[in-house]
């Protein structure tokens, strides 16, 4: 049985779909009263709980072999954010502790490329660059770095865990519309008539889901893996969208 936290999120619901397609048993952890549209039609178990509730996590992990921890809050705003830090750091600490108590076979934690130390533009980012909870900008960035370090420190205490760090995730089933998903939608609807300089490494959400499963199956305990796609300029991305919708 696989427990997926953050199961209705963009990566989470695609991961659940991929696990189901492979015949894997899935238990999805949802917030109380959370909408289930992203998981509609899937043969899964649903339990309600919160990563800030240790008792709920222990109940959710009963009989679970693998935990995919994706639950968290995303913010692109600079500065501190107490709720982001609490959910992403304390929530992950709780998941780690519950995983160790439940004796799960493996924890797969979804971190972020933004948790990795910033380097000059000419340097290629790879897994040799450390996580940096201090020198990076937003509350989200630092919270993901701190949470990742918590997971890796738990490995030294006996937890079997691996970490994945996706880059810019795009693709289908973006029910809540991420920042990039909203930009893509607005561009397709001709609501955005301008472009901006710059580029980013984008990765298909379906590849991320498969990467998570590969990390579970083949990843080495205590290692982290960057899930990357292709560097695309924003202007190229927007031009491609306009071309496909006939604008």
Task: Please report, for each region that a protein language model flagged, where it lies by residue.
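A conserved pocket-lining segment of Rossmann-fold NAD(P)-dependent short-chain dehydrogenase/reductase
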Residues: 131-135, 182-207
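N-terminal Rossmann NAD(P)H-binding glycine-rich loop of SDR-like oxidoreductase domains
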Residues: 2-22
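Glycine/proline-rich active-site loop of Rossmann-fold NAD(P)-dependent oxidoreductases
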Residues: 171-182, 215-225
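Conserved Rossmann-fold NAD(P)-dependent oxidoreductase catalytic core, especially the SDR/UDP-sugar
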Residues: 90-140
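Mid/C-terminal beta-alpha module of Rossmann-like enzyme folds, strongest
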Residues: 211-247
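NAD(P)H-binding glycine-rich loop region in Rossmannoid oxidoreductase-like domains
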Residues: 34-40, 44-90, 98
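Conserved beta-loop-beta element that borders a ligand/cofactor-binding pocket
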Residues: 111, 149-172
């Amino acid at each position: 049985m696989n427990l997926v936290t953050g199961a209705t999120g963009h990566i989470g619901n695609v991961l659940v779909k991929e696990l189901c397609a492979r015949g894997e048993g899935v238990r999805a952890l949802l917030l109380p009263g959370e909408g289930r549209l992203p998981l509609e039609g899937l043969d899964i178990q649903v339990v309600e709980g919160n990563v800030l509730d240790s008792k709920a996590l222990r109940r959710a992990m009963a009989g679970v072999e693998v935990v995919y921890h994706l639950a968290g809050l995303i913010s692109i705003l600079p500065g501190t954010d107490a709720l982001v830090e609490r959910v992403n750091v304390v929530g992950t600490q709780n998941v780690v502790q519950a995983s160790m108590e439940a004796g799960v076979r493996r924890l797969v934690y979804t971190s972020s490329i933004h948790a990795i130390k910033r380097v000059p533009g000419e340097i290629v980012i790879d897994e040799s660059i450390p996580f940096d909870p201090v020198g990076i900008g937003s509350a989200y960035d630092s919270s993901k770095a701190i949470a990742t370090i918590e997971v890796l420190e738990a490995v030294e205490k006996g937890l079997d865990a691996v970490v994945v760090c996706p880059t810019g995730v795009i693709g289908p089933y973006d029910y809540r519309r991420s920042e990039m998903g909203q930009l893509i939608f607005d561009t397709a609807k001709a609501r955005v008539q301008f472009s901006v300089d710059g580029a980013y490494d984008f990765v298909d959400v379906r590849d991320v889901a498969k990467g998570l499963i590969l990390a579970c199956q083949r990843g080495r305990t205590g290692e982290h893996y960057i899930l990357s796609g292709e560097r695309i300029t924003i202007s190229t991305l927007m031009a491609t969208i306009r071309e496909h919708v006939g604008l």
